């Protein structure tokens, strides 16, 4: 019996794979428990169409992330903080502050988890932050910290 796995099965394979299994195992366990569907021509055609659509969506997402990376590489944000003696900040710049400043100044919303550096910005001046946007795409954001 041919089946199409809907969920990962540790001993059999990953979701989306077509496998040949014994009739009893396929019917009584895999299909009954919702791990697989009987691999008919219609189901296989639908699965192939779903994979094609997913690949197109992934390609569109990668293009948009590359455009965002290009935009971020050219962008510079300015963060104003109180300075102590010798140009040191009271506290440090947080990922939330960087994400908020990027949204306010360039209308670009990113999740703070994309900022990979540990953000040890404790002095005024220009700093570069590495951003990982996903799918192996990186950008460098230029941050200028100025005192009040």
From Swiss-Prot:
Keyword RNA-binding: yes
HAMAP family in UniProt: Ribosomal_bL9 (MF_00503)
Database matches in NCBIfam families: L9
Pfam families to which the protein is assigned, alphabetical: Ribosomal_L9_C, Ribosomal_L9_N
Domain of life, per lineage: Bacteria
Gene3D superfamilies tied to this protein: Ribosomal protein L9, C-terminal domain (3.10.430.100), Ribosomal protein L9, N-terminal domain (3.40.5.10)
Residue intervals passing through the bilayer: none
GO CC annotations, alphabetized: ribonucleoprotein complex; ribosome
Keywords: Ribonucleoprotein, Ribosomal protein, RNA-binding, rRNA-binding
An MF annotation (GO) of this entry: structural constituent of ribosome
GO biological process, one term: translation
Name of this chain's protein: Large ribosomal subunit protein bL9
Family: Belongs to the bacterial ribosomal protein bL9 family.
